[in-house]
Amino acid sequence: VIIGHRGAPGYRPEHTLASYELAFRMGVDWVDVDLVPTKDGQLVARHEPEIGGTTDVAKHPEFANRKKTVVLDGVTTTGWFTQDFTLAELKTLRAVERIPQNRPHNTLYNGRYRIASYQEVLDLTTRLGRELHRTLGTYPEVKHSTFFQSIGNPTEPKLVAILRRNGLDRPDAPAIIQSFEVSNLIALHQQVRTPLLQLTSATGAPADFVAKGDKRTYADLVTPQGLRDVAKYAKYLGPDKAQVIPRDKNDNLGTPTALVADAHKAGLKVQPYTFRNENPFLPANLRSSAEPDAYGDVFTEEAAFFAAGVDGFFADQPDTALESLHAFLGR
């Protein structure tokens, strides 16, 4: 399974309807939709609540007084935050490319697309599914769960309501809920029948563990016992790709860990993140040059992960990833 990570952000500004539509038309059946809440209780597709880096909000003088500093999961962040805007206000903004140094061509599309609500993404998914005669789905991700609970604007009840309203509260739904936190997924497992995916990072610990003084880290979640615990509430594991195949001291691809085998033994499917074609994101020996916007040999990287037994992965260039998949399957 290839999941369009934030749509197809190798080609269009991330998390826009244009990015999702392109991903589906390229051939993936799934897109990853990060969700954060608005002031009026809507869910919008953004990677984090701070929108200065992915929209033109700084050019809107009417919102200048909304700029503030927030401590987000222990990190001090200054900017503009979705929870301080209504959906209607967010709709007056336009998306811009997050990493123009790596994706200068995407700046062509700056200012063309609005911020999308999750409902709009679901509507697009349904419409394109009918047109393309395929079952298309989303991987909604609850971002910064503990933070939004702490300010009284939790994402989870809103997500549950949207899933139910759209007939997605079922085990075979074309939706898979993701989170880097644990307690919210355990709670969601009791509330909905939609499948769950536990995300893990190569470093650090889940924000809910840190907030509660739980000393466990992401490394503890991916031990054989940790994976058995995850499998009690989740069907999928979404590790950092470095947890599947770490880089060596020269930043080249190393040897696969036992993670895939251990996760499969626990009954989990493994879908790591994130595959990107541009040089800075690739292992050193697969880079074509020092140019930050040039492509390197991502096919070799992706082939190594298929050989390691993963069940799919998240990719910024879905067309490239699908080509890797077809090569692996011998099509």
Give the ranges of each region predicted by the language model.
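Phosphate-group recognition and catalysis centered on beta-loop-alpha active-site segments
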Residues: V1-R331
